[in-house]
Regions:
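Aromatic-residue-lined binding/catalytic grooves and analogous aromatic/hydrophobic interfacial grooves
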Residues: 252
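Extracellular/periplasmic, surface-exposed regions of secreted and cell-surface proteins
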Residues: 1-245
Length: 264
């Protein structure tokens, strides 16, 4: 493993951007990334990840001029795009290759253990990029040239997450189940800020506050289904804690006698 890590790293990429501004009212920007990674096998090394963003400066419109004494700024914006991630194997390089280990032993014939090599990681030549599809919708609002309000709602879906496929049953005979691009999760939330600035005499007064709400949900993670649905992590937040929920303490012998059997 150490000798593999000492090999030179190689990544290639091509990026482009095109922006357009019409009369400081309408804005559009397009981006793309065309990236190649050594971490994947031939045929899966290159990924194309586009993005586009648009904006409308409403307060710069002629029809809006009668309102500018009150609404000094109004801008609407939206964006959607994809981002690729090739660093999905941790510190392991060439994650599409299988590995063997000279460990373990098996019993044959006269019950003597015979050592040998075993499959440590199953090869997966189809492993590829993890892809994140991001959306963002926001606004910028200014009032009386003193108060600035900004808000952004975002939604992010990460697909092809590299996880172990624990749905493979033990009778298949694998000592280690393969890593595959089957994980998926989504996250969403809102970021907001409020800023006030004014000048009182020779003193500049500024105040700022922020607000953030974030949530997420596991959509698919390769785990085998549990006996009870509430034990499954799919549909829950990432790093969700599981455990028994206490309902209280016994306050009398009668409550103990009427209660179900308790587990120690």
């Amino acid at each position: 493993i150490s000798s593999i890590k000492s090999l030179p790293y190689k990544n290639q990429g091509l990026a482009g951007r095109l922006t357009y501004d019409y009369d400081s009212r309408y804005f559009i920007e397009g981006n793309f990334g065309y990236n190649g990674s050594e971490n994947f096998a031939a045929g899966h090394r290159v990924g194309f990840f586009p993005a586009v963003a648009v904006g409308w400066y409403v307060s710069n419109e002629k029809f809006f001029s009668p309102l500018t004494d009150v609404v000094s700024k109004l801008k609407l914006k939206a964006s959607v795009g994809q981002v690729g991630n090739d660093q999905i194997g941790g510190d392991v390089r060439f994650i599409y290759l299988g590995t063997v280990a000279n460990t373990g032993s098996y019993v044959y014939g006269n019950y003597t253990k015979t050592s040998g090599e075993r499959v440590n990681e199953v090869a997966n030549p189809n492993v590829g990029w993890e892809v994140s599809t991001k959306q963002n919708y926001g606004f910028e609002l200014g009032l009386f040239n003193k108060l600035e309000i900004q808000g952004d709602w975002y939604h992010d879906v990460r697909d092809h997450i590299f996880v172990r496929n624990n749905n493979i049953p033990a009778y298949v005979g694998m000592t280690t189940v393969p890593m595959v691009n089957i994980g998926k999760m989504k996250s969403w939330g809102f970021d907001g800020s409020l800023e006030y600035h004014d000048k009182i005499g020779q003193v500049n007064v500024t105040g700022r506050g922020t607000f953030t709400y974030a949530n997420n949900e596991i959509l698919r993670n390769g785990d085998a289904l549990n006996k009870y649905p509430w034990m499954n992590s799919v549909g829950q937040k990432i790093y969700q804690k599981f455990g028994w929920e206490a309902v209280g303490l016994f306050e009398s012998q009668g409550e103990i006698d009427r209660s179900p059997i308790q587990f120690s």
